[in-house]
Amino acid sequence: MKPQFPSAPRRRVMILAGILALVFVSASLLARPFRPVEPIPAGIVDMHCHIAGLGAGGSGCFVSPRLRDNWRFKVYLRSFGVSEQEMLQQGDALVGDRISESLAQSKLVSRAVLLALDGVVDADGNLDTNRTEVFVPNEFVAAMAERHTNLLFGASVNPYRRDALARLEWAKARGAVLVKWIPPIMDIDPSDPRLVPFYKKMAELSLPLLSHTGEEKSFSRATEALGDPEKLRLPLGLGVTVVAAHTAAAEKYHGERGPDRLARLMREFPNLYADISALTQFNRRGSLKEALTRPEFSGRLVYGTDYPLINTLMVSPWYSFHLSLRQKFSIWRTQNPWDRDVMMKHDLGVPTETFARSAKMFGGTNVSAVRREIHADERSK
C-alpha cells in the first residue's frame, strides 16, 4: 500500500509548528531571571487592587453605558468572579466580598489596597456623569475596608471638585492610605498650577498619590498625554510622595519613552516611586526587565497587581521566555491569582525589598483603631 504523505501546505505548517516548539523549549531551558532571585517576604501588601460596581445595593458606583456596551465589560466581570445578575441581586458589595475571600486564600499576600475611582468633574466642580466611564465612590470603598480586615482604603478625589480639600480630610479620617488617580480618564492635568492647594493638603495629611502613568487601554477612551510622568513634577516639588503606576511603560510623550522620562524624575526626587503592577501583561512585555535592571529604579519599586487584570488572558507565564518550563507549569497550576502573580514576579527576579515595600508604605496604618473611632462616633450620634 502506498504511504500517504501530508500535502505541501500541511507539511509547511507542521514544519513551522515544529520550529516554534523547538524555539519555545530551547528558550525555556535557557531561561534566566532578570536579576538574582531573592526570598519572598511574609505579609505582602498589594497596593494596586481595583473594584467596581453597577450601583446595586445603593453603592453609588456606576459604569457608563458606553463601557457596558464595550467588550471589556464582560471581561472585567469574569475577572472579578461575578456575573451582572449576581451583582444586581446581591449588591455591589459582593465584588468586595469576593476579592476579600480570594485574598484570604492567598498564601503569599495578606492585604490589598482597594482603590476608589473618582470621575470627571465639570466646570462647576461637580461630578460629570456624561463624561465619566467608571465611578467608585470613597464611601463604598471605605465601607468595604471596614467590613474586611484584609482590605485597606485607597481613596480617589478629583482635585477639580469644589470640596476637594474636605474630601481629602474625610478620606484621611476614614483610614485612607493613599489617593488614586487615572488622569487620562479623569481629565486631570497633574501639572496644573491650580492644584497647588490640593497637593499641599495631601502633603499635610501624609497621603501619597498613586497616579497612572504610561499607556491606558483599559477603558473605551483616554487622553494619553495626561499619563506623562513629567506632569508629576509639580506634586513632587511640593513634597507629595508619588507612586507612578506601571513605570510609565508602553507609551511615548513628545517623542520620548515614558520610562526614560520617569527615570529622569527618579534622579531628581527621592519622594518618587513606581509600582510594578501590570508589568507582566502581554502589552507591556519587557517592561518588568527594564524596571528591575535600570539603576534609577533601584530601591524605588513597589509591589502591586492591578487586580482584576491578573485574572485575564493578558497575564500568563507562557508569554515569558525568562521562565523555565517547570516554573511555567508551577505558576499555571496555581489557583490563587495573588499567589500566581507573586510567584511569576519572584521567578523573574523581583527582589525582596520590592515585595516588602508596600507593607512599609501603606500597611502600617492602624486600621483597627480608625474603625473603632468611626464606630464610636456613629454610636455617639
Regions found by a protein language model. Name each.
Residues 48-52, 158, 184-185, 214-216, ...:
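Catalytic metal-binding/acid-base residues of hydrolase active sites
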Residues 3, 30-33, 241, 248-381:
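H/E-rich (His + Asp/Glu) clusters that bind or coordinate divalent metals
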Residues 45-49, 112-114, 152-155, 179-181, ...:
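Hydrophobic faces of well-ordered beta-strands that scaffold small-molecule active sites
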Residues 4-22:
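N-terminal Sec-pathway targeting helices
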Residues 61-63, 80-89, 121-133, 218-226, ...:
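Short, flexible/disordered intra-domain loops and linkers
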Residues 116-224, 288:
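Active-site gating/metal-coordination segments in enzymes
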Residues 25-115, 121-132, 359-362, 369, ...:
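An N-terminally biased module of ancient metal coordination in phosphate/nucleic-acid-related enzymes
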Residues 94-101, 137-139, 164, 226-232, ...:
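Alpha-helical scaffolding within the catalytic cores
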